[in-house]
């Protein structure tokens, strides 16, 4: 009987020591503080949402505003604001590289931003509609000029005409025209006039002969044969 009673007493939980009591007390206090912080955070979210709902409502009623930029917010606040804007039937975007500096802009549906405007905000620049319109016009002008140049095709230069114009002030228009015809007829063999591929005269010799023929036509003399 004594052994049975001793076994029962030894199996019973011993009373907590002073150290265990202190640990449990701190755990209860920490749990209470955590619960209080959670309640405060929840209340702050509720108040923040009410404040955003009022600002969005004022924005909608103000006919002079088409967009509104908010101060930088943390991720949770931005999420709440996006939700409020969506419920109100508006459009919203977040901009900014660093998370601490990101902000929200809201737009009325009928004044939704273009891709160019959004790109400007993403680059951290202010949107200037006038500059954007000027840039668009310059781009369209450059495109039209390219299309017109493509339709006209490459410029074709006439070698005979160029030769005639180049030497007309030296040997006269008639002689220059004759030289141009000679070069054009013999272009298969190069730029030097050729007679059955045996004429090895230079351009200057050919021009001298043309001058001589011109003088003879004017004076009525007869041109001596050339070797």
Curated annotation (Swiss-Prot):
Protein location: Nucleus
Protein name (Swiss-Prot/TrEMBL): Sperm-associated antigen 7
Spans through the membrane: none
Any one Gene Ontology cellular component term annotated for this protein: nucleus
Species of provenance: Homo sapiens (Human)
Keywords per UniProt: Acetylation, Nucleus, Phosphoprotein
UniProt modified residues of type Phosphoserine: 114, 158, 202
Motif (Nuclear localization signal): 35-51, 122-139
């Amino acid at each position: 009987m004594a052994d049975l009673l001793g076994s029962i007493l030894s199996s019973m939980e011993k009373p907590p020591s002073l150290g265990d009591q202190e640990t449990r007390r701190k755990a209860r206090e920490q749990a209470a503080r955590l619960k209080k912080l959670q309640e405060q955070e929840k209340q702050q979210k509720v108040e923040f949402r009410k404040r955003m709902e009022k600002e969005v409502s004022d924005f909608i009623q103000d006919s002079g505003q088409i967009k509104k930029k908010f101060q930088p917010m943390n991720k949770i606040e931005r999420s709440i604001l996006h939700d409020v804007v969506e419920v109100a039937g508006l459009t919203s975007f977040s901009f900014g590289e660093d998370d601490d500096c990101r902000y929200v802009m809201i737009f009325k549906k009928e004044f939704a931003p273009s891709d160019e405007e959004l790109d400007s905000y993403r680059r951290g620049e202010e949107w200037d509609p006038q500059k954007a319109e000027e840039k668009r016009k310059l781009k369209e002008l450059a495109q039209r000029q390219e299309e017109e140049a493509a339709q006209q095709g490459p410029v074709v230069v006439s070698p005979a005409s160029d030769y005639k114009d180049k030497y007309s002030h030296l040997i006269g228009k008639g002689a220059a025209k004759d030289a141009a015809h000679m070069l054009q007829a013999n272009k298969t063999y190069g730029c030097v006039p050729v007679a059955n591929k045996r004429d090895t005269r230079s351009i200057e010799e050919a021009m001298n002969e043309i001058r001589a023929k011109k003088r003879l036509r004017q004076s009525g003399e007869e041109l001596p044969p050339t070797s």
